[in-house]
Amino acid sequence: MASVFLYHVVGDLTVGKPEMVEFYETETVESAIRAIGESTECGIPVWRKRTTPSLPGFVENSEMRQQRFVGILNSLDIVAFLAKTECLQEEKAMKIPVSEVVSPDNTLLKQVDPGTRLIDALEMMKQGVRRLLVPKSVVWRGMSKRFSILYNGKWLKNSENSSSSSGLSADSTNRPTTSMTSSRDKFCCLSREDVIRFLIGVLGALAPLPLTSISTLGIINQNYNFIEASLPAIEATRRPLCDPSAIAVLEQTENEQQFKIIGEISASKLWKCDYLAAAWALANLYAGQFVMGVEDNMSSRSFSDFLQTSFPGGEQNGTATNAKKFSSRSIGFNPTSPTRLSIGRSMYRGRSAPLTCKTSSSLAAVMAQMLSHRATHVWVTEADSDDVLVGVVGYGEILTAVTKQPSAFVPSNRSYEGFGNENQS
């Protein structure tokens, strides 16, 4: 294991991070859309308001704060919710409180001390934590004397003996392990994207991992969600999503023995789209049509404008067959084969093309792809065949790779057979 994980602490990653402003569950969907556009990982933590009166000198402890955390709301959650028939009214839909949209799961965020070792933080994230809540403006001490801590760019020596020589335990992250003073309720929020960005800066310390292929590392996740291009796009949201929040849109190859990826329905792709237009498309189009048209044809137009110009006489029936922007010809639907989509590769390249890499791609290359595109994942295709999907690599897989012992690597000739979880009802 790289020493960088032992000698760095969570506080090192908070330098320059802004103070977190809580987003409450009573806020509207309209407010959530604005907040998500400025967020990391295409989602925002959602909180309940404090029920305890603000008494003089009262400071909320970590347990109380953890109970107020509801879950993380992302762009795909909002689009899927708005795709419901009763929500396709712009004025009404935008005023709905996010408490009706967010899926409760308060295990996705955890409050930690700035002195928490980076390796302990990575283990938490590997177990499902997506955000770390870190107190700001603290004066702290108490780590084991075996470590000199780099915090806010300065090396600090600990002045007290630790009660345990084994480092931080899982328990110690649930309560303050340091003597500290802090400004009341000032925190910053670290995401997995922040951690990957930090790791990019210390790649040399991780050698030889960064230049090792993802297939050799054995981190290609084959347990992904997918939907066939000829199925209604709304089917992609019928089942609970795993991490990452993404569904691959696939079509069979000519020999019908393999599937190739032509697009995706994901929080990353919907991050800064026109949410109402995307919701209409999700509710009314085939998956293949959706991945080609939602961004290029609709992102710059309002939902009401789309309805007025797409259907003669202001027709707003989502099943109308004479829509202009999403006609069968314009999106590549083959009229001679009503049960199958025939989509040329050139028609879905561009902004709606999925982010892909090869099984032979290095770990460093995949990390760089994710950061440069602000994506939560990269789809993996066969090394010798474009677009034939074998799996996905997300934040969880990368964190597993950088903390894995070299002896745990798998051979690079690993067989990739089978598929992920098909999303159909």
From Swiss-Prot:
Chain ranges of the CBS domain: 16-90, 347-409
Polar residues composition-biased segments: 173-182
UniProt xrefs under InterPro entries: AMPK_gamma/SDS23_families, CBS_dom, CBS_dom_sf
Localization annotation: Vacuole membrane
Superkingdom per UniProt: Eukaryota
Membrane topology summary: Multi-pass membrane protein
UniProt keyword annotations, A-Z: CBS domain, Membrane, Repeat, Transmembrane, Transmembrane helix, Vacuole
GO CC annotation, single: plant-type vacuole
Protein name per its UniProtKB record: CBS domain-containing protein CBSX6
Organism the protein comes from: Arabidopsis thaliana (Mouse-ear cress)
